[in-house]
Structures are given as C-alpha cells and as structure tokens.
Amino acid sequence: MIKIFIFLTALIVLSGCGSVVKLIDPTEKYTAYAGVAYDLEMAQQWGLPILDLPLSFLLDTVLLPYAWAQ
C-alpha cells in the first residue's frame, strides 16, 4: 500500500504544476485558469499532466483575483 502511495505521489509531483509554470513565465501575462489550459495542452503531447489537472484547477481558482487584477 505504501509503494502505491509513493508511486502516485511521485507521478503527481513529476507531472509539474501547470499553474506554477504559467506564473513564473515572464513572457506571458497570467490569465484565468492558465494552469488548466497549460495542463490540457501538455496532456495532448503526453498524458501525465492530466493527473495535475485537479490541483491546477484549485490553485487557479485561488489565483482568480490575481488574474483579474492584471
């Protein structure tokens, strides 16, 4: 059971967080749900970012006031 938990945790961590990737990208303005859009774009290339989609959705929802302020 512990091995499964460690494996799933590693998959989520290694997939990266789309919201963080979009926040630290200085070339683009942060928009509402940019992390979710990034995850969906990356999921077309390889399926692992789909695991990060719920986490990016939550973080993007928290960051909505920041996106609106820009």
From Swiss-Prot:
Q: Cell membrane: present as a keyword of the record?
A: yes
GO CC, sorted alphabetically, is: plasma membrane
Keyword annotations for this protein, in alphabetical order, are:
Cell membrane, Membrane, Transmembrane, Transmembrane helix
Residues that span the membrane, as ranges: 4-24, 48-68
Record keyword Membrane present: yes
Q: Name one Pfam family in it.
A: DUF1375
What InterPro entries does the database record attribute to this sequence?
DUF1375
* Localization: Cell membrane
Which top-level group of life is the source organism from? Bacteria
Q: How does it sit in the membrane?
A: Multi-pass membrane protein
Question: What is the protein name stated in its UniProt record?
Answer: Uncharacterized protein HI_0650
Q: What is the scientific name of the source organism?
A: Haemophilus influenzae (strain ATCC 51907 / DSM 11121 / KW20 / Rd)
Q: What is the lineage of its organism?
A: Bacteria, Pseudomonadati, Pseudomonadota, Gammaproteobacteria, Pasteurellales
